[in-house]
């Protein structure tokens, strides 16, 4: 939001919620996140996008990619394709005609194929130095109902495909992401090349570790909450906005902390005391003093 304010841009708050099986979205989280963003930024997001509500767009682009010969339906097992990829060899499915892949595509969407039986791949170059970029998977079959969208769709996009299409749809000019997602930039650039699009400017940040919390992830915290180890997302032992609010942190102090770190690819490790000092400084500056 700070960059949007500085350069008169707009903030797109997007829920990349197309994984129905491994990391299904929490229905309550949509409202929570919007509320927490408004608290932290001091304003609502300019645009709010739920990917699960925009499935027809992603499926249309996937079909267009297949028709144009830039993608195909792969029926190899994960193990079989791994072997082809490691040996820089094309799998048999790669030579399918567009009409053959479209027939399989229809079967995928009609629910006639089981999970894992087929995926849609972006056709790149199987001799690329980076194995992760070789004919990477864009969409897969998921029969597990979506917590919000239900069982309307049988084929769901993976994050790299979905977010790339949505960035284009929303006119995104700058992407700020963790440096661990550099391969996502490389994959999406190849996809954009297929469609004849210019890829947005990409900026990266390094990992920020707070000593007292150690290593943590959203999925790890969710697991600990579901197991009863933590008492919800506002548990004071968790590094969430909800918990920090309960501990008395102001939104401005958190913003000042992150702005102070700056946008750098360097990994940073700090004590919680550093974060607390920003909050204490604001409290001290606004405290009423009597002589």
Predicted regions and their residues:
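Conserved short loop/turn motifs at secondary-structure junctions
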Residues: 14-23, 47-56, 79, 176-177, ...
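A glycine-rich helix N-cap at a beta->alpha junction
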Residues: 29-54, 61
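Short acidic (Asp/Glu) and glycine-rich catalytic loops that position anionic groups and cofactors
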Residues: 9-13, 41-42, 164-172, 220-221, ...
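Active-site cores that bind ATP or allylic diphosphates and position pyrophosphate for catalysis
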Residues: 50, 64-221, 229, 240, ...
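Short glycine/serine/threonine/alanine-rich loop segments
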Residues: 8-9, 42, 70, 197
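Extended, domain-scale alpha-helical bundle/helix-rich regions
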Residues: 234-291
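Histidine-anchored nucleotide/phosphate-binding helix
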Residues: 1-8
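Secondary-structure capping and boundary motifs in well-ordered enzyme cores
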Residues: 25, 29, 54-57, 154, ...
């Amino acid at each position: 939001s700070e960059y949007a304010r500085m350069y008169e841009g707009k903030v797109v708050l997007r829920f990349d919620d197309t994984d129905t099986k491994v990391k299904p979205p929490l229905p309550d989280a949509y409202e929570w996140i919007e509320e927490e963003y408004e608290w932290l930024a001091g304003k609502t997001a300019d645009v709010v996008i739920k990917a699960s509500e925009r499935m027809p767009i992603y499926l249309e682009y996937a079909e267009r990619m297949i028709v144009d010969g830039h993608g195909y339906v792969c029926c190899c097992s994960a193990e079989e394709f791994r072997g082809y990829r490691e040996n820089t060899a094309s799998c048999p499915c790669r030579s399918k005609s567009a009409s053959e892949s479209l027939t399989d595509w229809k079967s995928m969407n009609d629910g006639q194929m089981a999970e894992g039986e087929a995926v849609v791949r972006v056709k790149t170059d199987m001799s690329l130095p980076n194995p992760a970029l070789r004919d990477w998977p864009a969409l897969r079959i998921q029969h597990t109902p979506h917590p919000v969208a239900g069982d309307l769709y049988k084929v769901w996009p993976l994050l790299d495909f979905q977010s790339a299409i949505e960035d284009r749809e929303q006119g995104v000019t700058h992407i700020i992401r963790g440096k661990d997602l550099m391969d996502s930039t490389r994959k999406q650039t190849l996809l954009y090349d297929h469609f004849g699009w210019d890829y947005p400017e990409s900026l990266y940040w390094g990992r920020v570790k707070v000593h007292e919390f150690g290593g943590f992830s959203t999925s790890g915290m969710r697991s600990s909450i579901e197991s009863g180890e933590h008492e919800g997302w506002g548990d004071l032992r968790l590094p969430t906005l909800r918990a920090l609010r309960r501990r008395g942190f102001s939104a401005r102090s958190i913003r000042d902390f992150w702005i102070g770190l700056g946008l750098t690819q360097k990994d940073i490790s700090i004590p919680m005391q550093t974060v607390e000092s920003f909050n204490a400084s604001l409290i001290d500056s606004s405290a009423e003093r009597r002589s």
